Amino acid sequence: MTVVLPTGEITHLGATVSKTSSGYSLLNLMIGSEGTLGIITELTLKIIPAPKATASLIMPFEDLKTALETVPKLKMSSLNPQAIEFMEREIVLASERHTGRSVFPQEMGGQPVGAYLLITLDSDSDDQLYTLLEQAAELVLDAGAMDVLVADSPAKMRDAWASRSAFLEVIME
């Protein structure tokens, strides 16, 4: 990234390696400053191809504590989730009323659900994705999930993430 500073000085930020120094990242500061620290005049982006296979998992838990304790286990695993969200029951219920979509189960085996994790996994093939989904299911069930529900179609994934995306609107009402 090339930036012109308020003094007129031209500076180049970024590197071809993932870690070049400790301390503050001038690159991230510049991006986050929205033009107040300098003007970006040149930017190089690395574009990666879209995944060939994607699915989301809805994982109900009896309580928020167990759901939250599962997040680091997912992040430290080899699954490399594209997204992880945790949600409490009350906001999910309000969101589903707001969107008119009923995606998240309210009880499992007669037990009320207290919290949810919603994750998205992607892969270069359906077979590889299926393996990742099995690994994720095993990990979260061992961690205390009540069940694992697969949103494997674009419509199911859209409904699950639309409920999550509506949280801010629901809170503002």
Q: For each of these PLM feature ranges, what is it?
A:
Residues 1-173:
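Noncatalytic alpha-helical scaffold of FAD-dependent oxidoreductases
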